[in-house]
């Protein structure tokens, strides 16, 4: 007796759902169309309204109209994005599920003549399923080439560096992140197991910055490994067992206003290593009987600490009781304002250090000066102040360095033969408005500086972005490699990776491009909202022929979501923003910044195999939005530092504040379709990207809600890669907690291991007692949202392998 009522209720429910979906698509589609976007959503909304009405009337034409909608959507989807599974998914998921629902007999019970209409709908759904399955195996974003150059039997020797060691942040101070070890290779890497785990005990506290991160790459020399923790505790470790030998605590005092709380690495000095430092030893002025072997630790409150590498005691003959005050002669000095987060370099005579400066807080911040200190006494030998008329002018009584001069926060690199330190710089803060910048403060911004490490004199400089308004720093340690040019001559090259995706390949002797660089016109105005007051723009920007950024401008076709609903909202949001490609000016309306603030390349850099003339890297692509907020430049400084680079930043002293955020959907997912992270292999003989693969899954993308399936999508990563003579690339970095190994020849994934916390660090490898190990810090990243921890994890082959 009640069955017809039940049927009516189920049908009514379906009609309501389809009707609501139709109204959402129709209203949103009209909004999008008025902004110049696709009219598909209007058409889909109208067809769904017809389906709802026909279903309400119990007419079989409801399924015919739905089949037409499905077929049209399939054709439209392929036209927009081809056979990209993740791009197709939000276009087809809701409609596909709803189509299957309409085939349930209980939903259409009481409707006559359904035979042919069900066949039509079933056919379109089958086409959609076949398309999705096909797209899984035919990813248009991936490049599936193969590097032909074989690995030589013998590796090039590096003076002063044992094959079994990893004595510097990038293994060598040339920043190559390549090891000649090959016990672990592409055939047996699948057998790696955890060999040991060390827990440092140094965890984020309630008083720490939101940007607390664990990004350290350990160094290993002989029988000692050294790491620094997030609070810059220096720990000496037995590399064979993972047992702690000793610990030195610099007693860092932090608060939540620190924009960064991290230590990416330390520097090692051995007075007996005369082979590596033959050139710079000519400038040596001192020695130390107390600390002939020492480890230098950059401390976030503005100190450089020297510790005896054998005993763990402070080198009291260095500076003042083992440390130099990097805040000395600093203008507007305050804890965390000038913040060394990355390792510098050491030579036979000098330790060179730079640091970050708080971004976007005010126009009265510390200097980004680069300094060279006597490696034994800590005496200030030279300065290079990037904002001064005379960068080498030494500070004196009553004088300070130039405030807000461009800083160098990334790791430095060093050519021991040329005695040149290579310094990647950013822009003088505030980053997003530069109307008051002087020519002097822009001269060395966003550049690669080649500086004589013994004298501090500039050898050459190359600017990668002019008048930067997008935070497009040079963020990576440069990599030095001798490569063959087109004439077959060996050229000493430097690879300068940038946030823009440009990889500038220069002769490291003189800064001249090896791979062509072209100045191209860039946008000068915005189309929505007022033009920025008091601002000016560079008419052109440099572009390298080697570029890992997407080469096409984003369009609303590239917008994404978990469903067609949030995808529609992302398309609307995209159309409402100012965007005319890379270098679109910031605006009050809001500007899409792509590549975004994280950049295509970050501090992880790339790995260069000089023996094989190949490089591997892990570029990312995640759009951001910057929105200028008009403000009185003379307003009082009422807010403390936010402890992060995102959100609202006050930019005191200039006529705007700024809000910076990732470009996300209403569900908190990126509005740009995946992939957001890749691994790639480049042939350095041709500078061709030979292979490129998505990396990372959505497993940990919603860590506070639930764990998602480990489906490869290509997620962002922070941290670098390494490679070995065993034809293996190792990389962590991604938002899911894994360490992975890839085949350097073709990019095939060979192995992965689940990490106990986020692996936003660059791994390293070494050998001891005849066994090769791979080590990564799994400690998480505050603003990146990965699981925090304190784990140093080592992997090795089982003894029977």
Swiss-Prot record:
Membrane topology: Multi-pass membrane protein
Reactions performed catalytically: D-glucose + A = D-glucono-1,5-lactone + AH2
Keyword presence, Cytoplasm: no
Needed co-factor(s): pyrroloquinoline quinone
Enzyme kind, highest EC tier: oxidoreductase
Database matches in Pfam families: PQQ
Positions of transmembrane segments: 39-55, 59-79, 94-108, 119-138
EC number(s) recorded for this UniProt protein: 1.1.99.35
Gene Ontology molecular-function annotations: quinone binding; quinoprotein glucose dehydrogenase activity
InterPro entries in the record: PQQ_b-propeller_rpt, PQQ_mDH, PQQ_rpt_dom, Quinoprotein_ADH-like_sf, Quinoprotein_DH_CS
Record's keyword annotation contains NAD: no
Annotated localization: Cell inner membrane
Catalytic residue list: 471 (proton acceptor)
Listed GO CC annotations: outer membrane-bounded periplasmic space; plasma membrane
Signal peptide: 1-33
Keyword line: Cell inner membrane, Cell membrane, Membrane, Oxidoreductase, PQQ, Signal, Transmembrane, Transmembrane helix
Family (UniProt): Belongs to the bacterial PQQ dehydrogenase family.
Assembly and interaction partners: Monomer.
Note: Acinetobacter calcoaceticus contains two different PQQ dependent enzymes with GDH activity. GDH-A prefers 2-deoxyglucose as substrate, the specific substrates for GDH-B are disaccharides.
PANTHER family in alphabetical order: QUINOPROTEIN ALCOHOL DEHYDROGENASE (CYTOCHROME C) (PTHR32303), QUINOPROTEIN GLUCOSE DEHYDROGENASE (PTHR32303:SF4)
Function according to Swiss-Prot or TrEMBL: Catalyzes an exceptionally high rate of oxidation of a wide range of aldose sugars, including D-glucose, galactose, arabinose and xylose, and also the disaccharides lactose, cellobiose and maltose.
Protein name per the record: Quinoprotein glucose dehydrogenase A
Native source organism of the sequence: Acinetobacter calcoaceticus
């Amino acid at each position: 007796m009640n069955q017809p009522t039940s049927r009516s209720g189920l049908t009514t429910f379906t009609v309501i759902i389809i009707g609501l979906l139709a109204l959402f698509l129709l209203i949103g589609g009209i909004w999008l169309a008025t902004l110049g976007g696709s009219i598909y959503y209007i058409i889909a909304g109208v067809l769904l309204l017809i389906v709802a009405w026909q279903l309400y009337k119990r007419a079989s034409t409801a399924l015919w109209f739905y089949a037409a909608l499905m077929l049209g959507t399939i054709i439209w989807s392929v036209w927009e994005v081809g056979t990209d599974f993740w791009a197709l998914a939000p276009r087809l998921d809701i409609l596909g599920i709803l189509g299957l629902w309409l085939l349930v007999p209980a939903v259409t019970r009481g409707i006559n003549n359904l035979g042919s209409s069900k066949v039509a709908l079933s056919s379109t759904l089958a086409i959609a399923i076949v398309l999705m399955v096909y797209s899984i195996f035919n990813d248009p974003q991936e490049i599936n080439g193969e590097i032909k150059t074989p690995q030589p039997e013998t590796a090039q020797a590096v003076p002063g560096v044992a094959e079994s060691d990893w004595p510097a942040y990038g293994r060598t101070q040339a920043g190559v992140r390549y090891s000649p070890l090959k016990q672990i290779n592409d055939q047996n890497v699948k057998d790696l197991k955890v060999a040991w785990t060390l827990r440092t005990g140094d965890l984020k506290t309630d008083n720490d910055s939101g940007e607390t991160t664990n990004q350290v790459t350990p160094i290993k020399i002989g029988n000692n490994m050294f790491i620094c923790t997030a609070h810059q505790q220096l720990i000496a470790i037995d590399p064979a067992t993972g047992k702690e030998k000793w610990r030195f605590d610099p007693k860092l005092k932090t608060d939540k206003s620190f924009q960064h709380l991290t230590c990416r690495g330390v520097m090692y000095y051995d007075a007996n290593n005369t082979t590596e430092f033959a050139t710079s030893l000519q400038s040596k002025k001192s020695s130390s009987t107390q600390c002939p072997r020492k480890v230098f630790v950059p401390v976030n409150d503005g100190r450089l600490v020297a510790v005896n590498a054998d005993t763990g005691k402070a080198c009291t003959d260095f500076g003042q009781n083992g440390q130099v005050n990097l805040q000395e002669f600093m203008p507007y000095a305050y804890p965390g304002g000038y913040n060394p987060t990355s390792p510098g370099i050491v030579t036979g005579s000098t330790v060179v250090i730079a640091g970050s400066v708080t971004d976007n807080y005010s126009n009265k911040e510390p200097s980004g000066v680069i300094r060279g200190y006597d490696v034994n006494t800590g005496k200030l030998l030279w300065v290079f102040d990037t904002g001064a008329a005379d960068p080498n002018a030494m500070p004196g009584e009553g004088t300070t360095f130039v405030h807000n001069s461009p800083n160098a926060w990334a790791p430095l690199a060093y050519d021991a033969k040329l005695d040149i330190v290579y310094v990647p710089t950013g822009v003088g803060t505030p980053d997003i408005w530069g109307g008051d910048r002087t020519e002097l403060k822009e001269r060395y911004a966003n550049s690669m500086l080649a500086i004589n490490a013994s004298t501090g004199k500039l050898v050459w400089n190359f600017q990668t972005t002019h008048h930067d308004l997008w935070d497009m720093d040079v963020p990576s340690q440069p990599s030095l490699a001798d490569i063959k040019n087109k004439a077959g001559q060996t050229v000493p090259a430097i690879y300068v990776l940038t946030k823009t995706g440009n990889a500038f390949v220069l002769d490291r002797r003189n800064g001249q491009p090896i791979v062509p660089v072209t100045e191209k016109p860039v946008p000068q105005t915005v189309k929505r909202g007022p033009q920025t007051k008091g601002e000016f723009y560079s008419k052109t920007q440099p572009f390298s022929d080697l570029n890992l950024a997407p080469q096409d401008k984003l369009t609303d076709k590239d917008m994404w979501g978990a469903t067609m609903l949030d995808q529609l909202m992302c398309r609307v949001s995209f159309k409402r923003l100012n965007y005319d490609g890379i270098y679109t000016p910031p605006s009050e309306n809001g500007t899409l910044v792509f590549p975004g603030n994280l950049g295509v390349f970050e501090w992880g850099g790339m790995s260069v195999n000089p023996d094989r003339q190949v490089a591997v890297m892990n570029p990312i692509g995640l759009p951001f939005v910057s929105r200028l907020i008009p403000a009185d430049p003379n307003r009082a400084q009422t807010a403390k530092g936010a402890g992060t680079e995102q959100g609202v930043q006050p930019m005191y002293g200039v006529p705007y504040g700024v809000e910076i955020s990732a470009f996300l959907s209403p569900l908190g997912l990126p509005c740009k379709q995946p992939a957001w992270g890749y691994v790639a292999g480049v042939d350095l003989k041709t500078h061709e990207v030979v292979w490129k693969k998505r990396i990372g899954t959505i497993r940990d993308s919603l860590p506070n809600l639930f764990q998602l399936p480990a489906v490869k999508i290509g997620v962002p990563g922070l941290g670098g890669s390494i490679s070995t003579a065993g034809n293996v690339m190792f990389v962590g970095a991604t938002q899911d907690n894994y360490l992975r190994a890839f085949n350097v020849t073709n990019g095939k994934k060979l192995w992965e291991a689940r990490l106990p916390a986020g692996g936003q660090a660059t791994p390293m490898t070494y050998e001891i007692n005849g066994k090769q190990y791979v080590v990564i810090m799994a400690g998480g990243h505050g603003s990146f949202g990965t699981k925090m921890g304190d784990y140093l994890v080592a992997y090795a082959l089982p003894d029977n392998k």
